[in-house]
Every structure is written in C-alpha cells, then in structure tokens.
C-alpha cells in the first residue's frame, strides 16, 4: 500500500503537475520518451485511470487502497466498485457480517467497514480529490497525455513544471512538477534521473519538502545539462512565457514583491536572449518552486522571465511581469547554494537576521560569485553583491520559508541547488548574451540590458559592492548599499521583507529577474547609475515606482521604457523601517543616504526614490488610506472644533429626542385613531381581510362579492358571505354536474339512488331557492357570482328539473365515485370524523377542507351521503336542525343543512351554527374558499348530494 500510496501521491502530484503542464502546454510534446513511457505507465495505472474513471481498482494495476478493492474485506460477489460495504444501518442485502447483517468483525455495526469508514465514493474522492484535479487540466492531461505526462518531463513538462512552480500555490505538486520539468529538461539528457525525479516528485509531493529536496538534488544533477536546457531555453522561455501558470504567478509569496519591473517588455525573450531568459525564467521557475513558495510572484515573474518583472506582491503580482528578479535571485540562490557558503554571504547573512537564509545565502553567494566569475562580466564585488542579494533574499526567503511548509524549504533548497547549477550555465549564456546584449539595444533583450547595465554596473557594483557590501553588512539599510547591489539584494531583501511580511510592492519591484535579470539588475543599476542622471533616475524611479505601484496593483506591466526600473527593494531592516511607513521610510532614506554616500547619485537617488516608492509601495491603498486619515484628522482638528460632547452624550441626546418624539407620537398617534376609526373603507379593508381569513375559500367568491357588493357594510359582508356560500353551493351543484369530480361525487352519492332522488328534488328546491338567493346575491355581486349564480340556477335548474340528467351527471358520477368514494369512504369516514365532520360538514368547509384535498372531500361526501355519517354531520353542523337523523329531516331540513344551507338553509344553517360555519369558513374556508370555486362548489354539490343521499 505504501507503494501504491506513493504511486498515488506521485500520480497525484504528477497529475497536478500534468495539469499545470497541460495548462502551460509546453511546446515539446515529449522529449524524454523513454521516461515518458515508464512514468506514463505508472501514472497511467495510478493516476490516469484514477484521475478520470472510477474504473475498478482491480482493473487498474493501481494499488491505491480503493475502497472497493478486495483487500478490504469485501466479497467479490458484490462487485468491486459497488458501494458494497456500507449497506446502511439496516443492511439490506447484507454484504456480510452478522447481527443485522450489520456485521461484526470488520463489518462494524457502525455501518462502515473497517477500512471503508468512508464510502468508496467519498473515500475515492478523498484520496482522489487532491489527486483528481479533473477540473484542472492536469487530470485530463494525465489521462490524455500519459505519454505527455512523461513528456512533461520533456519540454512541456518543463514549462509546465515551470508554470507549476509558478503556481507555487499548487505548491508541492507544482514544485515536484517543476523539478520534474527541470529534471525532464535534464531528463532529455538523463531520463533515468528524470524518472527517478518524477517518481520522487510523486513521493515528494506527498512527502512534501523531503521529496522536493530529493527532487531538487536530482534536478540539480540534470541541471548541469542546462546547456541542453539552455538550447531549449528559448522555447522554454517562450513556453514559460506562454505557460499560464507562469504568467499568472501564484501570488503565493510576498516575494513576488521583487518586481523590478524589467523595462524590456515580455516579448524580450528573443530566441537568443530567450534561452538565457528562459533559463532565467526556468531558474526563476525553479526558484519559484524553491523560492516561489516564498513568492508566488516569482513564478509569475519568471513566467515573464523574459518579460518584465512582476510588480511587488502587494500589487497583484500574480500577473505581474515575471519576477525576473525573483528568478534571478533564485537562480543566484541556487547557484549560491550549489557553491558552498561564501564569506560574503556569511557576513551578509550574519547581518541578515534570518539564520536559514544565511546558510543558503552563503551558498548562493558562493554560487553567485562563481556564476559571476564565470560570467566574468561581474567582479567579485558584483558576485558579492549578487550573492549578497541572494543572501538577503535567502534570508528573506527563509523567514518566508519558515512560514511555509518544510517542503517548500526543501524544494527551494533543491531548486536553489538546481538553479545554482543551471544558473551557472545560464550565467555563462548570459555572459555571452551580456557581451552581445551590452552592444544590443536594451529593449532587444533583457540579457542585453543586463549586459550593458552589467558592464557599467559591474564596475560600479564591484566598487560599491566591495566597499559597500561591508556597509550593507553593517546595516540592513546598507544592504541597499549599491543600487545594483541593492537591486539584487533587494530582490532577495524584498523577498525577505515581503516574507518578513513587508510584502511591499517596492521590495518586490526592486527585485530583479534571474541571471539575465541579474544582468538586468546590474543593467538597471547601471542604468540608474549611469544612464539616468541621478535626478532623472530619481524621477524615473519615482515614476517607475508609481507606475510599478500601479502595475503592481494591476497585472505586471513591463516598463517598456528603459528608465531605471530599480524598485526599492527593502531589506528586511528597511522593511521594518518601511512598514511603519513614514518613519521607517525616512530612516531608510537616511540609512541609504549614509550607506550609499559612496554610491553614485543615481543609485542613491533611485534608492531614495525607491524609499519613497517603498512608502508609496507600502501599498498605494495603505498610503492613501493613511493620507486620508491624516487629512481627516487635520481638517477635524482645525476646521471642526469638537463640541466637547462625547459620543455617548451625543447619541444619548439623539436617543432622548427620539424617545420624546415617539412618546408624543404615541399620544397623538393617528394610527390609534385609525384603528378606532370606523369608516366604510376601513370596514371594507377589515371586512375583506376578515372575510378572506374567515373563508378564504369562499373569499374568491366572497371577496369578489364583497368587492362587488358594498364591502363597506358589515351586514352586507355577512349577507355576502351567505350569498357567496349559497353561490358556492349553487356553483358546487352546477359544477358537480360539470365537474368530473363533482360528477364522480355525484355518482358516489348516487350510490344511494334514493338519496339521488331526494337530492334531485331537494336540489331542485335548493337550486330554485339558491337561484333566487344567488340571483339576489348575484344582483348584489353581479360580476363573477351573478353569472355563476344565474348559471347555477339555470344549470342547477336543468339538472334539478331534469333530475335524471342532473342526478345522472351528478349522481351517475356519484355512483361511480360512490364506490370509489366509499372505498375512499373508509378513509373519508376517518377523514371526516378525524376532520371533524361536524365542522367540516356543517360548513361544508369540512367539505371545503376536503375540497382543498378533493379526494378527502369526495370521501367526506361519501361519508356525508352515508346516512350514518350525514346524521352525524347534521348533529355536528346543524346542532339543532340536523340532529334529526332521518332522511326526511334531511330532505326537509337538508336544505337547511350545511350543504344546502348554502343554498337555502344556508341562512338558517348560519343562524343555527353561524359560529361553526364561520369558523369553518375561517379554518377550512381559508384553505378551500379559493378552491370553493371548484372544490367549494364540489363541496356544496357534495353537501347537496350528501343531503339527498342522507335524505
């Protein structure tokens, strides 16, 4: 299982890697094919199938502890993939286990199996969720490009990995991916090593930093082959430029702050310079992987490794120009790491507060020195400066690492080592490019800028760095000592500071790109020193800072201008100063002035500008907010004298006023008068409301009637209610004939044909009476009801008169429904009794209630028909009249009865049981009144039919 877990984790990490790869879409599909195959197979088994399909584990050679593998006591018979265990508490289909087949032993009574404490789906998704980034192209990439995944090791994987590292946020996976990329780059030369790396990357992704360390070292091994990589560098650089991840740096770490925005636009990756840039960006990527954790910005920065540096983290560096500075720093760090610790580094690191950074920086410094020596463009002083910047960077990195997981540290270290080797190669390439670049326009290539700048900067830096690094060592402000020095140290420092938490844009801005960027750094420093006159540089720096701040806020904008783009990199100390913003920034300026007094004005001024910009880049929003607050306080103090009243007093005053006003209002409150006020409109409103409440069922009708009649008069309301109920009854009758339900009810009722006959006669009478009433009521409420009432009279009359037809439609229907209803009547009976036939029936709001449930109504009708029940309903409803249980009484009084009462006896019914009736209307009426149009009519029909049947 451990193996499977490893493969799982490996595949998972590789999958995420794959996703990043597929996202970044390296151009080379798969360069390391052999590796691709071996790895592909593993991955295919572990990750690919897994990522995508829920195919049974047994089918996959995967050893992942899939919940449905036999291993977890599961019978084959249930099918591997079936959620076999976990049958639930009452295990239906008892998979096995005793008890309730709830299972003992591994089958815990707790429904989950021993291992399957999680359902396979859940378990899978659990194991899978990290792994299965199906949303991320990775899983797809995995399954789609198994080979590609190995080819991931190839260029695609390298750029993808770069992008992976860039989205260091994807951290370990991406880290491993990046390392895989580097290893795959190397792996083109040495696929075996790459394979190990890939495997290790998997394991490492799981193991975290440890694996990354391994990967780093492995990657470092191939890194020396970076020449091959360098050759592919251009494409890689373009890839890295292309790779979305790289472009969208994981804003993972403040390091991104190192955003010396390179002037050269992202396009700068010219094929030739591009390889160095791509190397730089790769280093940046590696560094991103290593230091990218520190600053996701670096990732973005390398992304644009050839492009501008990404703005500081504060400004969304995510898409800032590649953190070439970061990449540079990282590469230098890695180089330094590859080299042993350097005395300079040590010194600087000692000065640096972070201890972790110290060792790394020493290593990086040495590596940088070696690189610089290899480059030859830079003197030892430059090397010192560069390595020192790395040292600060590593210091800053390390604090950041401290915040980050050990994996990141390990990855970073490995990457630094890797990058150190790679950067050495890169530096060699860069030196070549430098010599070219110095001659070539700065815009043509960043390395060219760097060469030019470095040519000048090397001298300046050598001088200033050699002399001033000590001063920088002396003070962290001194770390800013040389602009060039500071540019690079600032890359480190800004990372440091950002890691330290300053995360200031300026720090990030000052950060430079990788070795190319290092050159750029030198170039920028030189530019700032030599190209721009100090004043111009200051202004430019400020402009840049402003623009960088803007860009920082926005996505990275490359300063295409060639102005010195040195953004203030804040040393952690500066950071400390700058965080307090004003004071620290000023202190920083002072320190810088003192430290850089030897420096050229340009550098100093750029630093000064950067200090200012550091303040501004502290975060424009921060500064702005501070500024606003200051203004507000100033204005308040000077222009708005305080009344001397405390907030408590002030609000108490308001509260008192409010209470007094409220009391006054309450005394005079017209609302009360309105309540008391008795006006037709009020009654209309109240009456309608009450009516609706009372008989929402009828309200459809009653409300209409009320509106149509004079809703103002309560008496009218009462009459209207009666009329509406009558109408409802009439409607019910007419609708009974019309309604299939009603007809079915009629049939139910017609089960007792005697009742039918009675009903017919009664209904004729009812209808005639109802007609008169409904006509009167319709005259009162002519609108909807009048036609209905008239309709009813006519239809009812026809039905009543043609009792056979009427009864047939109703009663025939009733006959049919009768049996059904009677079948339902058992229910209906229960219902009615349960429902309280008394209420429901008397009002036929019972029916109405049932009408809300027509089935119930039908049943209730049956019950009502049932002489047994009807008498009861009589008793309940017509407490007096209806107590006569005889059908005769029903016939005679049935009209007065609840159903018919709506017709004629309605008034009597109301009188006899007015409160119950109204209560019904209120209760059941609410449900049913609206239904009353149909169901209400049905109810009335039911009532009528019930009454006749009762009769």
UniProtKB/Swiss-Prot annotation:
InterPro entries given in the database record: THRAP3_BCLAF1
Pro residues: bias regions: 266-276
Compositionally skewed regions (Acidic residues) per UniProt: 926-936
Species of provenance: Xenopus laevis
Self-association state and partner proteins as the record states: Associated with the large multiprotein complex TRAP (Mediator complex-like).
Originating gene: thrap3
Ranges of biased composition (kind: Basic and acidic residues): 58-75, 144-155, 167-188, 347-387, 411-449, 460-483, 490-518, 537-547, 661-677, 688-758, 877-891
Localisation: Nucleus
Composition bias, Polar residues: 204-220
Biased composition (Basic residues): 14-51, 121-143, 759-772
Superkingdom as given in the UniProt entry: Eukaryota
Name listed for the protein in its UniProt record: Thyroid hormone receptor-associated protein 3
TM annotation in the entry: none
Region of interest called Disordered, as start-end residue ranges on this chain: 1-94, 117-558, 661-951
PANTHER family recorded: THRAP3/BCLAF1, THYROID HORMONE RECEPTOR-ASSOCIATED PROTEIN 3
Binding residues for ATP: 549-556
Function as written in the Swiss-Prot or TrEMBL entry: Involved in pre-mRNA splicing. Involved in nuclear mRNA decay. Initially thought to play a role in transcriptional coactivation through its association with the TRAP complex; however, it is not regarded as a stable Mediator complex subunit. May play a role in the positive regulation of the circadian clock.
């Amino acid at each position: 299982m451990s193996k499977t877990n490893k493969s799982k984790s490996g595949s998972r990490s590789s999958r995420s890697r794959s996703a990043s790869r597929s996202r970044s879409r390296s151009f080379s599909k798969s360069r390391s094919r052999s590796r691709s195959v071996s790895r592909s197979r593993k991955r295919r088994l572990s990750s690919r199938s897994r990522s995508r399909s829920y195919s049974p584990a047994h089918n996959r050679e995967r050893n992942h502890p899939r919940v449905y593998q036999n291993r977890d006591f599961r019978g084959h018979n249930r099918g591997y993939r079936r959620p076999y265990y976990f049958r639930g508490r009452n295990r239906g289909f008892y998979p096995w286990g005793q008890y309730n087949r709830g299972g003992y032993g591994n089958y815990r009574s707790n429904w989950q199996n021993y291992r399957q404490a999680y359902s396979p789906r859940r378990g899978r998704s659990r194991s899978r969720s990290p792994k299965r980034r199906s949303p991320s192209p990775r899983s797809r990439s995995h399954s789609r490009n198994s080979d590609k995944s190995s080819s991931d090791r190839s260029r695609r994987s390298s750029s993808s990995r770069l992008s992976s590292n860039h989205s260091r946020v994807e951290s370990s996976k991406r880290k491993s991916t990046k390392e895989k990329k580097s290893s795959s780059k190397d792996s083109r030369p040495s696929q075996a090593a790459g394979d190990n790396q890939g495997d290790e990357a998997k394991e490492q992704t799981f193991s975290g930093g440890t694996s990354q360390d391994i990967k780093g070292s492995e990657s470092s091994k191939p890194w020396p082959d970076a020449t091959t990589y360098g050759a592919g560098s251009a494409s890689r650089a373009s890839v890295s430029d292309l790779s979305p991840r790289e472009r969208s740096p994981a804003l993972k770490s403040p390091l991104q702050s190192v955003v010396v925005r390179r002037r050269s636009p992202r396009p700068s990756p010219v094929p030739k310079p591009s390889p160095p840039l791509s190397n730089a960006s790769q280093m940046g990527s590696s560094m991103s992987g290593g230091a990218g954790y520190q600053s996701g910005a670096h990732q973005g920065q390398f992304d644009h490794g050839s492009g501008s540096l990404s703005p500081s983290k504060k400004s969304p560096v995510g898409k800032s120009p590649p953190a070439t500075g970061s990449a540079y720093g990282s590469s230098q760090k890695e180089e330094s790491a590859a080299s042993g610790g350097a005395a300079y580094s040590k010194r600087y690191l000692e000065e640096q507060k972070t201890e972790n950074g110290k060792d790394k920086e020493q290593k990086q410094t040495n590596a940088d020195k070696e690189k610089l020596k290899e480059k030859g463009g830079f003197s030892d002083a430059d090397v010192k400066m560069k390595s020192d910047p790395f040292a600060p960077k590593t210091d800053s990195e390390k604090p950041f690492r401290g915040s980050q997981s050990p994996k990141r540290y390990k990855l970073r270290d490995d990457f630094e080592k890797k990058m150190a080797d790679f950067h050495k190669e890169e530096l060699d390439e860069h030196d070549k490019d430098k010599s070219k670049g110095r001659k070539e326009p700065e815009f043509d290539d960043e390395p060219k800028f760097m060469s030019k700048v470095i040519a000048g900067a090397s001298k300046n830096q050598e001088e200033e760095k050699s002399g001033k690094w000590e001063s920088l060592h002396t003070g962290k402000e001194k770390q800013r000592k040389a602009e060039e020095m500071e540019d690079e140290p600032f890359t480190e420092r800004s990372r440091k500071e950002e890691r330290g938490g300053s995360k200031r844009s300026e720090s990030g801005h000052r950060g430079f790109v990788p070795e190319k960027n290092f050159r750029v750094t030198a170039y920028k420093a030189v530019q700032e020193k030599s190209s721009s006159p100090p004043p111009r540089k200051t202004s430019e720096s400020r402009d840049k800072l402003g623009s960088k701040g803007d860009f920082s806020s926005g996505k990275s904008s490359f300063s295409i201008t060639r102005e010195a783009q040195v953004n203030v990199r804040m040393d952690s100390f500066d950071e400390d100063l700058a965080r307090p913003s004003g004071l620290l920034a000023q202190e920083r300026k002072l320190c810088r002035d003192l430290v850089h007094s030897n420096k050229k004005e340009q550098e100093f001024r750029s630093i000064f500008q950067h200090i200012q910009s550091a303040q501004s880049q502290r975060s424009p929003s921060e500064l702005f907010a501070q500024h606003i607050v200051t203004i507000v306080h100033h204005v308040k103090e000077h222009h708005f004298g305080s009344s001397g009243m405390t907030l408590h007093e002030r609000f108490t005053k308001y509260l008192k006023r409010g209470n007094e006003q409220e009391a006054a209002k309450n005394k005079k409150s017209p609302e009360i008068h309105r309540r008391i006020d008795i006006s037709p409109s009020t009654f209309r409103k109240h009456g309608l409301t009450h009516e609706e409440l009372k008989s929402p069922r009828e309200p459809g009708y009653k409300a209409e009637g009320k509106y149509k009649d004079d809703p103002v008069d309560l008496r009218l309301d009462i009459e209207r209610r009666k009329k509406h109920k009558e109408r409802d009854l009439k409607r019910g009758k007419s609708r009974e004939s019309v309604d299939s339900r009603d007809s079915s009810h009629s049939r139910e009722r017609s089960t007792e044909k005697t009742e039918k006959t009675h009903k017919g006669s009664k209904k004729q009478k009812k209808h005639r009476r109802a007609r008169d009433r409904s006509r009167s009521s319709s005259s009162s409420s002519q609108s909807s009801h009048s036609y209905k009432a008239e309709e009813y009279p006519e239809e009812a009359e026809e039905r009543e008169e043609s009792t056979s037809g009427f009864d047939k439609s109703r009663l025939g229907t009733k006959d049919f429904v009768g049996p059904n209803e009677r079948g339902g009547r058992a229910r209906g009976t229960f219902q009615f009794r349960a429902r309280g036939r008394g209420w429901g029936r008397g009002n036929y709001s019972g029916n109405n209630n049932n009408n809300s449930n027509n089935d119930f109504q039908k049943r209730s009708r049956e019950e009502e028909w049932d002489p047994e029940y009807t008498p009861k309903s009589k008793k309940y409803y017509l407490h007096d009249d209806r107590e006569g249980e005889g059908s005769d009484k029903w016939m005679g009084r049935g009209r007065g009865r609840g159903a018919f009462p709506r017709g004629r006896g309605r008034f009597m019914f109301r009188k006899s049981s007015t409160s119950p009736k109204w209560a019904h209307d209120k209760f059941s009426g609410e449900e049913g009144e609206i239904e009353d149009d149909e169901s209400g009519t049905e109810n009335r029909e039911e009532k009528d039919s019930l009454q006749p049947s009762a009769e």
